[in-house]
């Protein structure tokens, strides 16, 4: 049985999701949207993403993909591969969200059951990109537009059967 999971990401118009270990913008309300969607779920991330966050995300089970596990803590597990992380996440009765970074998105996007994508209405320099994907493989089910300190739009896609 295939594990059902969603990718969630914020990117600039030019697909940048990071610069070094930082997000190259602050869009008021965007992180609250991320929190609302992922709270209560299981989040899967690469080591660099975990290091940039600096701690496990609260109110979520955190799974970090790394070749060098650091030991487990409450609501925090380490796995050596994407496949192992998805297997572990499937045993936890919660929605599963892949939250980055670029390499992890690239390895999981083709089998995602849903995408939660926020596009910040700016072009920025960076070194971590959200991968291109076949939009015809997904149905767009929701779009929301926001204007705070920056304009951004949220799109929710589900995979076609």
Predicted regions and their residues:
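Enzymes that bind and transform nitrogen-containing heteroaromatic metabolites
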Residues: 1-161
